[in-house]
């Protein structure tokens, strides 16, 4: 894949054969063919546009309760941590929550604005996106 991607345009970190045990709460599992941690949303966009169409993409957040088989993950794994971490309130009663936001942070944000319905997230480890 590195041959097909202009890595000079990437600002994030692209790793080959990255052990998923470093990215899950279970601390087990084989390697991802490629693991990408984008620098920001623009960098993520550049990376995704460079990934070959036939290559599978797997998204991970904190990896809480994510069990990866010993054979690893084919294709590319993209971490949303630190990238898709937006929290916005609009129309006084709606929230936009990015996939990289910790569940407990989302629940607290809603409570701060007097919104209900996601209180259960306070007890769930990990991020909205996994």
Labelled PLM ranges:
Residues 2-128:
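Anion-binding (especially nucleotide phosphate/pyrophosphate-binding) glycine-rich loop
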């Amino acid at each position: 894949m590195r041959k097909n991607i202009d890595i000079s345009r990437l600002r994030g970190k692209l790793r080959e054969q990255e052990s998923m045990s470093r990215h899950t709460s279970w601390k087990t599992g084989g390697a991802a063919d490629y693991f990408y941690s984008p620098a920001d949303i623009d960098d993520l966009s550049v990376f995704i546009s460079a990934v070959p169409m036939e290559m599978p993409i797997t998204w991970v957040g904190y990896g809480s309760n994510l069990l990866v088989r010993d054979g690893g993950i084919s294709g590319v794994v993209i971490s949303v941590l630190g990238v898709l971490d937006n929290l916005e309130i609009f129309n006084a009663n709606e929230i936009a929550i990015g996939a990289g936001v910790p569940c407990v942070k989302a629940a607290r944000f809603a409570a701060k604005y007097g919104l209900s319905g996601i209180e259960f997230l306070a007890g769930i480890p990990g991020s909205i996106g996994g």
